[in-house]
Amino acid sequence: MNQWTVGNARFTAITDGVIRMEYTKDAVFADGATLFANRSCPAAGAAFTQEGDIVTIATKKLTLTYRVGAPFAPESLSAKIHTGKVETTWKYGDKNENNLGGTLATLDGVDGHRPLPDGLLSRDGWHVIDDSGTPVFVDGWLQCRSQEHLCDLYLFAYGHDYPAALQDLAFVSGKMALPRKYALGSWYSRWWRYSAEQFLQLVDEYDANDFPLDILVMDMDWHYQDWGYEEGDPRALYGYGHAGGNLGWTGYTWNRREIPDPAGLLAQLHRRGIAVTLNDHPADGIRDHEETYPAFTKMLREKHYQEEVPLIPDKQSERERENSKRDVVNFRFNAGSRDYMEAFFESTHTQYEKMGVDFWWLDWQQDYLYPMVNGLGTLTHLPWLNYLYYAHSRKNGLRGMSFSRWGGFGDHKHPIYFSGDTVSTWDTLAFQVYMTVSAGNAGCFWWSHDIGGFEDPSPEKQSELYVRWVQFGITSAALRLHVCGNEKIDRRPWTWGEPYCSAMREMFHLRSMLIPYLYSIAYESYRDSVPMLRPLYFFDSENKEAYDHPTTYYLGGSMLAAPVCQPGEGETFLALSKVYLPAGTWYDYFTGIRYKGGKVITIQNDLYSFPLFVRAGKPLPMQPYTNRMTSTPLSHLIVRIFGGEETLSDSFTLFEDDGITEGYMSGAYRATELIYKYDGKNRTFSYTPTGDGYPGECTSRTLTLELWDIEEACCADAPKGTAFTYDANRRCGKLEIPGFSPTDAFSVTLTNL
C-alpha cells in the first residue's frame, strides 16, 4: 500500500486521483472501514519524496505537499492538480466554489426550489469529502474512533473527467449497488387504511384498466395504531410517538381487523406477480403490546441486554407516564447496540419476511428525538439504519433492497431511496427533476419519488400536472405513485378521467416496454459507476451549453429526456419546450422526426408525449407491453433502431439475469451485444450473446427488429423463418426472427432495393 506516516500525519494514495489525509494528536491512525470508506480499494502508484520538513506525494493527477510537524492548515497542506485541461491548486480549507450540486436527504415539505448540498463533481476539478470523527467498524459493528484522531479527509482530483470522479468514489467507498429488478417497475402506494380485500381489488383494477403493477406498498395502516383505534385492539402504552402523540406510529402487529390472514394475502399477491413492502417507523422499537414482543425480549434476555438509551423526559408521552408503574419491561430503540438490533430484526422482520414480506420501507423521521445513534458519537441514525436494513435484506443469496431517505456520501451502496413528502406544484416538479439529475453527482443513482406529489394544496385536481409528473417517472429510476391520506386525492390513474387516464396509460405502457433497456443501463450504472440519469455535462464537460439545461438529461447512453415542467395551453395542453440536443443525430421517440444535435431546438408536446429522444443508430432493446413489466420472461425481444440515411455504427449491451439475487456478481447473467452498422448500402444487425446464463432464463426467443426512417423497402439476408414487412407510413422496416435460442449468435443483412 502506498501509505506514508510523517509525524502526526498519514497519507494514503488510493487512486491516481484520490489521497486520504489523516492528522492525529498521538500518531495513532484509523485503519477500520467506516460507513463511507470500505478500505478494500487498490493502492495507486505514487512517488514520495522529502526535502527537509517538506514532503511531496505525486500521482498522475496531483502533487500533494505537506510541512512535517504542522497541523493541517492552508499554509501546511496543499496540492497541485493536473488533469487534462485543468491545472489548479487546492489548499486545506478551500471552499469548492463551483460545485455542481448533490442531493438533499429528503424532500419532506418541499414546495419549489431548495439549495442543494455539494456533490462530488465540481467545475473546480476537485472535491474533499470529510470523514473525520465517524465511527469505524470493529468485528462487524461500529465503534467510536479515538478523539485524538482529529482529521480524516479524502481529496478527489479529477479535473473535468466526471466519470473518473465517480469511479474513484466507487473505489474508495464501494460500488453503486444494483437494486432488485422490480424496483424499476410500477409501484402503487397510498397512505390509506386498506383491507385485504381492497388490496386485492387494487391489483384487479390495475389489470382491468390496463395499467402495469409490480410492487404494492402497504403504508403504516398495515399495523395497529392510535388513529382508528377500536376497543380491544393492541395499543401502545409506552414510547414517544409522532405526529401529535400518536404512539402507534411505530408498529409491528398486523391489523387483523383489516388483514385477518396476512400470510394468505401475501401469498395471493405473490401468485399474481406482485412484490410487497411494509412501512416501518422504528423509533419506538418493539413494545409489550406487539405480538413479537415475547420473542424479542427472550432474545434480549439471552444476550443479557441492559437498557442503555437515556430517557428524554420532556418528550415522554402522557400515556407512558400514566402506565409507568406497570410490571412490564420496555426497551428504548437502540440502534447503537448490536444485541438490540440483532433481536429487533430476527424476532420481527425475519418472521414477517418468512410470511412473505419482500422488503421494508424504512421511514425514519425522528432525528428530533434521537439526533445521534446511542453510543456512536455524532453519527446520525439515517445512514446507519440504511446500512443495517440493507445488510439484513441480503439473505439467502438475495441482493440487498432498502427503501429509505438518502444518508449522504457512502449511502450509494444501499439502494433504493425515497424522497419524501413533497407539495404538488409545478415548481416542485421542476426542482425534483433538477435534484434527481444532480443526485448522481453524489453517487445517488436510485431516487424513487412520490409521483404526483404527496400533499396537494390545490382545491381542484391538478390533472395536467399529474400526467407530466408521471412522464418524469417514466424516465427516472422508479415509477411510484403515492399520496397522503386525503380522501379527495387518489393516485389511481383511471380515476382521473379523460384525456388524463389515456395519456398516463400510454406512459405506463412505454415504461413497461422500455424495461429491457432500463435494466441494462441499471447494470451499467453498477458496472461502470455512471448514473442512470446523467446530466448533459457528464460526458461533455468543456461545453458551456451543457451546464445551462439542468432538467435535460441522458437516460443511459442512448436516450435523452426533458420532462415538461410547466403547464401547456389549450384543450390539448400543448407545451412548448426548448431542449438542447448534444452533438450527433437524434430522433424524437414519439414522432420519429430527425434532428441534428449541437444546438437548442424548440418542440411542442401535447399531453400524450414529452421531449424524449433516441440517439441515431443505437439499438434500443424493448419488450411487448406486459402488466408485470419486471418479472415477465423476455421471450419476445424488440430492438428498435432509428437509423436513417447516415452511415454509422453503434452498439448496445442487453443485460439479463434473475433480477433478485447476487448471482450476477459471479457470472450468472447473459450479456448480449446488439450491433448495428450502415455503410451507405447495407444495414447489418448482429446479435452476440456472452455470459454463463442464469436460472430461469428463457430457452426460446422471438426477435422483432424495427428499423425506422428508411426511405424504401428492404430485402433481408437473415436466418430461416425470418419474416419481413415494411410500413411506408412510418417508414419502418420490420424483421421478425422466431424461435431461436437466446444463446445463439447470428447476424442479419438488409440491402436497399
What are these regions (language model features)?
Residues 12-53:
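A low-complexity, Ser/Thr/Gly/Pro-enriched, surface-exposed linker/loop concept
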Residues 177-372:
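Aromatic-lined carbohydrate-binding/catalytic grooves of carbohydrate-active enzymes
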Residues 399-400, 409-417, 431, 439-449, ...:
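Catalytic core of carbohydrate-active enzymes
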